[in-house]
Amino acid sequence: MKLLIPSAKELNEQARIVEPQPLSENTKTILQALRAFSLEELATFYGISEERALVEKERIEALLAGSAKTYPALELFDGLMYRSIERQDLSEKEQAYLQEHLLITTALYGVLPAYEGIAPHRLDFMMKLKPAGKSLKAFWKEDYDQAVEGEEQILSLLSSEFEQVFSKAIRERMIRIKFMENRGGTLKIHSTISKKARGAMVTAMMKEEITHLEDLKSLEVAGFSYREDLSQEKEWIFVKE
C-alpha cells in the first residue's frame, strides 16, 4: 500500500539536517536546464524579483555542487497539509510506517520516501520548463509510474497537478478521498479544511497502522466519517456533519 501526497511551496529550513543523497540523472538534467537561465530569465520564469531569483540561483548552484543543506522531505515541506501531519516526537515504529508507505511527489526529485534528504528548491509542474525537450510532466511520467509499480493499493491525496503526471493506467487504479462538509443540508468542499483533513488522514493512518485501505472506512478523521451512500468504487467521500 502506498499513500501519495504532493510537495508544498512553503519550506521549513529549521528542520533537522540529514546526509544528502546522490542526485538522480533526471534531477541533474532539470537543474542544468535551470542553471542555463540568466538571472533576469530566472526571475521571469519564477515570476519573482531578481533579488529573490538570486537566492534560487544560489540554491541551484549549491545542489549541483553537492554543497546544499538537505532535510527530510516530510519535515522540509511545510504547507498547511504538512503542518496538519503529526511529525514531531514520533516513535521508531511510526517513522518506519511513514518511510514504508508514504510517498511525496515532487517536480525536482520525482517520487520520494518520506524521509529522503532533499534541499530547498522552487519548482512545480505548472512551470514551463522543458528538460530534455519534454514538459516536466512527460519528463517524470515513467519514473512516477515505476514508484508505484506492483502496488495493489494506491491512495491518492494529490492535487490534479501531481496526479496527472502518472499514466492513465496508474490513475485508474488510485483511490481518491474527498472531504465534504454538510452545511445546512448542502455538501461543500472547502480547500483549507480539505488540506488539514488530508494531513489528519496521514496521521490517522500512521497511528492505526493502516495497510489495507478498506480499513480507512471505519476511521473518523478530524470529524470526517466515510459515507458509503455518496462514495464510488475509486472515490471515497468523507463527510463532516
Region locations from a protein language model:
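Active-site helix-to-loop segments that bind/position phosphate- or nucleotide-bearing substrates
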Residues: 2-89
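Internal, well-folded beta-alpha domain core
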Residues: 86-233, 237-241
